[in-house]
């Protein structure tokens, strides 16, 4: 496995862009207040600007009419509000939207998933990923770099603006954010935590801590550190009932095995209010790899001391992967075993797979658009070759 990324990298906060200006999307509220103090202004000005930035998705200082013109002009000289731009949009038949978003000369993917009672945004934390999970398309890209705060919160800002942020109402349709896009969030704590702070801040997006979820594959020291930094909902990418299987499909397990990982999860739960006492277990269903009835019994025994709910995820294929999707009958049988043990078990409905926006598929189109044709063939779909 590739060397893990150092989570203690120098923070990108308050580093001017090439044009010499500070991108205010890089600053959480405390940092924003410090920025205004350094300008000789009152700290409450930071709250006013943040409200315009996040409640109304404004990137124009001239819109901020409750701020005097002298200060607006001063801000234009030293600061900017620059979110990453959408360079491609794809819409699924089920309403899911996937955006390819430019971050410098690279791209990450962000997915909007509407449901009857909520709208969830799946956000990326890195360009690529270092963890090399064998069933994940993003892992095939390898790791490139961590995203800045502005590139993480900027995905939420851009999506909110696109799907209906309006100054007239001050409402935003995005109700939940999940850090489940490209990358391992715990390997970019320096930037992920301030971005999540903005998501939670009343002058930011104002989301409940129960509606912001971080998903991790198990970087244990960083998980312990996270618990001292912020309280958000936690989901863990477990995907195996024992170390033998997990070593193979989630290589970080060789460094931090399941027992070590789950102990860290329980430590996090002891500190957290956001999780309401239990963690979400993510378990991708791989045909004849981790989906046997015996595996379900092993999983139940493994999790008996960890309060949790379990999401079973039908695997989404991509070219070159040596796996198949578990049949519905195998998934149902697996689920029944877990429910018989008393676990809340949900089979996740696949969303956006027709645009490669489903779990484990992000980065497919960015790497090679022709792979979408191959994926559809793997799923037995009819394709219009001229449209590819």
Curated annotation (Swiss-Prot):
<dbReference type="GO" id="GO:0046872">
    <property type="term" value="F:metal ion binding"/>
</dbReference>
<keyword id="KW-0479">Metal-binding</keyword>
<dbReference type="InterPro" id="IPR013785">
    <property type="entry name" value="Aldolase_TIM"/>
</dbReference>
<dbReference type="InterPro" id="IPR040072">
    <property type="entry name" value="Methyltransferase_A"/>
</dbReference>
<keyword id="KW-0963">Cytoplasm</keyword>
<feature type="binding site">
    <location>
        <begin position="237"/>
        <end position="239"/>
    </location>
    <ligand>
        <name>S-adenosyl-L-methionine</name>
    </ligand>
</feature>
<keyword id="KW-0808">Transferase</keyword>
<feature type="binding site">
    <location>
        <begin position="183"/>
        <end position="184"/>
    </location>
    <ligand>
        <name>S-adenosyl-L-methionine</name>
    </ligand>
</feature>
<keyword id="KW-0411">Iron-sulfur</keyword>
<feature type="binding site">
    <location>
        <position position="133"/>
    </location>
    <ligand>
        <name>[4Fe-4S] cluster</name>
    </ligand>
</feature>
<feature type="binding site">
    <location>
        <position position="215"/>
    </location>
    <ligand>
        <name>S-adenosyl-L-methionine</name>
    </ligand>
</feature>
<dbReference type="GO" id="GO:0005737">
    <property type="term" value="C:cytoplasm"/>
</dbReference>
<dbReference type="GO" id="GO:0002935">
    <property type="term" value="F:tRNA (adenine(37)-C2)-methyltransferase activity"/>
</dbReference>
<feature type="binding site">
    <location>
        <position position="316"/>
    </location>
    <ligand>
        <name>S-adenosyl-L-methionine</name>
    </ligand>
</feature>
<comment type="similarity">
    <text>Belongs to the radical SAM superfamily. RlmN family.</text>
</comment>
<comment type="function">
    <text>Specifically methylates position 2 of adenine 2503 in 23S rRNA and position 2 of adenine 37 in tRNAs. m2A2503 modification seems to play a crucial role in the proofreading step occurring at the peptidyl transferase center and thus would serve to optimize ribosomal fidelity.</text>
</comment>
<dbReference type="GO" id="GO:0070040">
    <property type="term" value="F:rRNA (adenine(2503)-C2-)-methyltransferase activity"/>
</dbReference>
<dbReference type="Pfam" id="PF21016">
    <property type="entry name" value="RlmN_N"/>
</dbReference>
<dbReference type="GO" id="GO:0030488">
    <property type="term" value="P:tRNA methylation"/>
</dbReference>
<dbReference type="Pfam" id="PF04055">
    <property type="entry name" value="Radical_SAM"/>
</dbReference>
<dbReference type="InterPro" id="IPR004383">
    <property type="entry name" value="rRNA_lsu_MTrfase_RlmN/Cfr"/>
</dbReference>
<keyword id="KW-0489">Methyltransferase</keyword>
<keyword id="KW-0949">S-adenosyl-L-methionine</keyword>
<dbReference type="GO" id="GO:0000049">
    <property type="term" value="F:tRNA binding"/>
</dbReference>
<dbReference type="InterPro" id="IPR007197">
    <property type="entry name" value="rSAM"/>
</dbReference>
<dbReference type="InterPro" id="IPR027492">
    <property type="entry name" value="RNA_MTrfase_RlmN"/>
</dbReference>
<keyword id="KW-0004">4Fe-4S</keyword>
<dbReference type="GO" id="GO:0019843">
    <property type="term" value="F:rRNA binding"/>
</dbReference>
<protein>
    <recommendedName>
        <fullName>Dual-specificity RNA methyltransferase RlmN</fullName>
        <ecNumber>2.1.1.192</ecNumber>
    </recommendedName>
</protein>
<feature type="disulfide bond" description="(transient)">
    <location>
        <begin position="122"/>
        <end position="359"/>
    </location>
</feature>
<keyword id="KW-0408">Iron</keyword>
<feature type="binding site">
    <location>
        <position position="129"/>
    </location>
    <ligand>
        <name>[4Fe-4S] cluster</name>
    </ligand>
</feature>
<feature type="domain" description="Radical SAM core">
    <location>
        <begin position="115"/>
        <end position="354"/>
    </location>
</feature>
<keyword id="KW-1015">Disulfide bond</keyword>
<dbReference type="GO" id="GO:0070475">
    <property type="term" value="P:rRNA base methylation"/>
</dbReference>
<dbReference type="InterPro" id="IPR048641">
    <property type="entry name" value="RlmN_N"/>
</dbReference>
<feature type="binding site">
    <location>
        <position position="136"/>
    </location>
    <ligand>
        <name>[4Fe-4S] cluster</name>
    </ligand>
</feature>
<keyword id="KW-0819">tRNA processing</keyword>
<feature type="active site" description="Proton acceptor">
    <location>
        <position position="109"/>
    </location>
</feature>
<keyword id="KW-0698">rRNA processing</keyword>
<feature type="active site" description="S-methylcysteine intermediate">
    <location>
        <position position="359"/>
    </location>
</feature>
<dbReference type="GO" id="GO:0051539">
    <property type="term" value="F:4 iron, 4 sulfur cluster binding"/>
</dbReference>
């Amino acid at each position: 496995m590739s060397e893990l990324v150092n989570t203690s990298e120098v923070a990108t906060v308050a580093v001017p862009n090439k044009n010499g200006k500070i991108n205010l999307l890089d600053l959480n509220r405390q940092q924003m207040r410090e920025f205004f103090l350094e300008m000789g202004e009152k700290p409450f000005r930071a709250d006013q600007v943040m409200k315009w930035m996040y409640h109304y998705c404004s990137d124009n200082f001239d819109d901020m009419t409750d701020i005097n013109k002298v200060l607006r002009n001063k801000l234009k000289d030293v600061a900017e509000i620059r979110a990453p731009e959408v360079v491609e949009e794809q819409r699924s038949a089920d309403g899911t939207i996937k955006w390819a978003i430019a971050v410098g000369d690279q791209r990450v993917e962000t997915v909007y998933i509407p449901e009857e009672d909520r709208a969830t945004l799946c956000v990326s934390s890195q360009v690529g990923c270092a963890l090399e999970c064998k069933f994940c398309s993003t892992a095939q890209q390898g790791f490139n770099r961590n995203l800045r705060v502005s590139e993480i919160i900027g995905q939420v800002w851009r999506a909110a603006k696109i799907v209906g942020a309006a100054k007239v109402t001050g409402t935003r349709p995005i109700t939940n954010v999940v850090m489940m896009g490209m990358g391992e969030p715990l390997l970019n704590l320096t930037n992920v935590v301030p971005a999540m702070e903005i998501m939670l801040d009343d002058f930011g997006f104002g989301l409940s801590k129960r509606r912001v979820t971080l998903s991790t594959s198990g970087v244990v020291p960083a998980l312990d550190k996270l618990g001292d930094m912020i309280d958000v909902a936690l989901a863990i990418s477990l995907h195996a009932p024992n170390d033998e299987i997990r070593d193979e499909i989630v290589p970080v397990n060789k460094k931090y095995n399941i027992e070590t990982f789950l102990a860290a999860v329980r430590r996090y739960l002891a500190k957290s209010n956001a999780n309401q006492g239990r963690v979400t277990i993510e378990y991708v269903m791989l045909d004849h790899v981790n989906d046997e009835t015996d595996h379900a019994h092993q999983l139940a025994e493994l999790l008996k001391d960890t309060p949790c709910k379990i999401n079973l995820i039908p695997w989404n294929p991509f070219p070159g992967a040596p796996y198949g999707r578990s049949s519905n009958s195998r998934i149902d049988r697996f689920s029944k075993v877990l429910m018989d043990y008393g676990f809340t078990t949900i089979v996740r409905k696949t969303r956006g797979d027709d645009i490669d926006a489903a779990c484990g598929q992000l980065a497919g189109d960015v790497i090679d658009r022709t792979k979408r044709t191959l994926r559809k063939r793997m799923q037995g779909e009819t394709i219009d070759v001229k449209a590819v």
